[in-house]
Structures are given as structure tokens and as C-alpha cells.
């Protein structure tokens, strides 16, 4: 009985909760669904632009992932993978399954080992109505001459960029070639007129025409400025007007026979005034100059040589050189007699000469003594080459020669 009452109370409580207090029906809230484990979503960042890849693309055969726009611009300049440096043969993009994908072959870029493929876009090399095929051929030869492993930049980046932009919109190769040919013809026809080029390309690209033309003109202007900075190629150059014949003819008419006989040329320069290059170089060559140190060393060396000669002459009494000895003067007689009495004839004369040179009272005029016939006494003079004469007192007399050492020889 108790169980029945409790069951009825439970049923009444459920009904009241379902119909509400005032009798309105209130449906029960549905039970929440079971929670699922959410794995973190991995977003691929492009290694080239370091941003989230909007359209994911993979390179074959290395299967590295990049942005589609980034890897397409990269393959325009090099077929090497930015990550592993392997040769990229094609690009996979818009991959839905193993059987649904788009594969774009890579062509027209520089290989890793320095080899170049065929130029992109059928070999177009026309910039603003002028043919640059010869120039592109020369520059490609320069790129091949570089060492292996070097990545050469595209020689005509305007059309490489244009071909890449068209390839992002049109995937069919024949249609892509036709569109590029049409753009080249428009550029050849209208040149640098931006308005006419925009009007001619408007049916093909629609609303994207203005942005495409603006970018195309900017890249073309940069390329043209770069080409103007470079030196002209071997097949190009500046054509100068050669007026040498007309000038020579006019000079021959104006010049008279007298001027021709005098040796005057058409330029007005006389051949008589011309000198050899060696002579003019010798005339303009400056005279050698000695440094002060070398000059002082040379002066000291000359003084030592003079001093040595003076000592030798004093020891031999001037007989070896054939000089006539003379008596010392009154001012220097005391020093000479003192040297002669102290050390004999030979060494005494050397000591006397040294003392005479070291004495500060001797003047430069009195230090220079030369033997003269009038100053020498007849009894002291000795014949040339004979024995030394003796004085009246019988004591030997030494002959002293004084040479001024303060003056240098020229």
C-alpha cells in the first residue's frame, strides 16, 4: 500500500513539473550530447612568407608545403626547394583526395647546378616595343659562366613575373601562351601609354586590370633603370658622327703652304716643339735630396778622414807627401816645443796637433797653416825628399800641419 502511494506521488510530481504550476505544458530540456575530445587544430605556416597558408601547395618530389603564391613566385627564379635545395619538378595544389588534385609543372627557371632551361613564355624578350633578344642571349652566356651552385636571377624579370601572374589564373598552357602573346602585342602597340594599355587589357582581366597594369609598369620601369646603369653590350653602342674628314678638308683649305712647310699640323701643334718623352721626364725629375741624418754622417766621416790624414802627415813630418816643414808660429810655439820635448819628433808632433785642435783659444784663421817659401827660414828648410833639417841648437824640430776641420768639402 505504501508503495502504491509513493508511486502515485511521484507520477503527480512529474506531471506537475511537466505541465507547470498553472497548467501550461512545459517540455523538458533535451539532455546535452556527450562531449567529444577536441584535438588541437594545426595550422601550416609558409616557410617563405612566415604567414598562414591560404592555399596550401606541395612540391614534388620532396613534398614540402608552402603557399601556392609563394612557391610559384619562387620557382620563377629557381627550381631549388627553399628547404632542402632539391630539384622541384612540379607543384601540387587544391588537393581534395588522392584522385582529385591539380599538378603544375615547373619550368623556365635556373637549375641548382647552374644549368638553365628554356625561357618562360616561349622565349619572349620584348620590352616596350624594342627587341632585346641579343641582350638576353649575352646575359644568359654570362650567367652560365658563373661557378656551379650559384643562383642566377632571371634575365627578363618583367615577362617572368607576367607569365607567373597569368599562370595563377589560367592553368591551360595553350591559353596561357595566347594570353601572354596578346599582352606582348598590346605593349608593342601602345608602349608606355598606361591608359591605352589598360583599355586594351580590360576585356581579358576585368576588375584586376588596373592593379595588373600598375604593377607591370613599375617592374618594367625598375628593369629599364637597371639596364640604363649597365655598360652597353658588345653589339650595342653609341653612334658618333665622324667629322674628321670634314675638319681635315676645312683645315687644308684654310692652311697656307707656308704653314705646311713650317711643320704645323691641322691641330695647330708644331712638330718642332715636340720632344721625346724620356727627355721631358728627365727634365721634370726633381734633384735627389739627402736627409739631415745622412748629411751629418757624411760630414763626420769626412772629418775623420781629414784627421787621419793630418795625423799621418804629422808623424812623417810631411816628407811622404813632399811638403816642406816649417817652424811653429809664436802663438803656438809653446805647445809645439812642449810636445817635441816630451815625446820626440814623431809622436810629439801628433800630440801637438791634437792639443792645438782641442784648444778653444785658437781661431779658425790661425788654425790653418800652410808652408810657404817666404815664411820658412833658409836654415830650417830642407830639400824636397831629403832628411829633415835640424835647428841651430842641434835639437830635432818636428813639423806640424794644421788643417781646419770645421769646413766641409763640397
Swiss-Prot record:
Catalysed reaction per UniProt? S-ubiquitinyl-[E2 ubiquitin-conjugating enzyme]-L-cysteine + [acceptor protein]-L-lysine = [E2 ubiquitin-conjugating enzyme]-L-cysteine + N(6)-ubiquitinyl-[acceptor protein]-L-lysine
PTM characteristics: Auto-ubiquitinated.
PANTHER family (alphabetical): E3 UBIQUITIN-PROTEIN LIGASE TOPORS (PTHR46077), TOP1 BINDING ARGININE_SERINE RICH PROTEIN, E3 UBIQUITIN LIGASE (PTHR46077:SF1)
Which species is listed as the source? Suid herpesvirus 1 (strain Indiana-Funkhauser / Becker)
Q: Which residues form a coiled coil?
A: none
Q: A Pfam family name for this chain?
A: zf-RING_2
CDD domains recorded for this chain? RING-HC_EHV1-like
Protein name per Swiss-Prot or TrEMBL: E3 ubiquitin-protein ligase ICP0
Cite the residue spans of the region called Disordered: 243-410
